[in-house]
Amino acid sequence: GVSCLCDSDGPSVRGNTLSGILWFYPSGCPSGWHNCKAHGPTIGWCCKQ
């Protein structure tokens, strides 16, 4: 997936590690991940937690 900013990464993408991924499946995030930001019915911002 494509990296994305999780809430735990900080307020901005500059200088922060992007620990999330954009996940393009309506079935939810991979095992061990959770959807930290809803982004439409088929895209989720998934974070490890």
Curated annotation (Swiss-Prot):
GO molecular function: sodium channel regulator activity; toxin activity
Organism superkingdom: Eukaryota
A single GO cellular-component term on record: nematocyst
Keyword match Ubl conjugation: no
Entries under InterPro entries matching the protein: Anenome_toxin, Myo_ane_neurotoxin_sf
Annotated signal peptide: none
Biological-process GO terms, alphabetical: regulation of signal transduction
Main location class: secreted
Intrachain S-S bonds: 4-46, 6-36, 29-47
Subcellular location: Secreted; Nematocyst
Key words, A-Z: Cardiotoxin, Disulfide bond, Ion channel impairing toxin, Nematocyst, Neurotoxin, Secreted, Toxin, Voltage-gated sodium channel impairing toxin
Function, as annotated: Binds specifically to voltage-gated sodium channels (Nav) (site 3), thereby delaying their inactivation during signal transduction. Thus it may strongly stimulate mammalian cardiac muscle contraction.
Family, similarity comment: Belongs to the sea anemone sodium channel inhibitory toxin family. Type I subfamily.
Protein name as catalogued: Delta-actitoxin-Axm1h
Organism: Anthopleura xanthogrammica
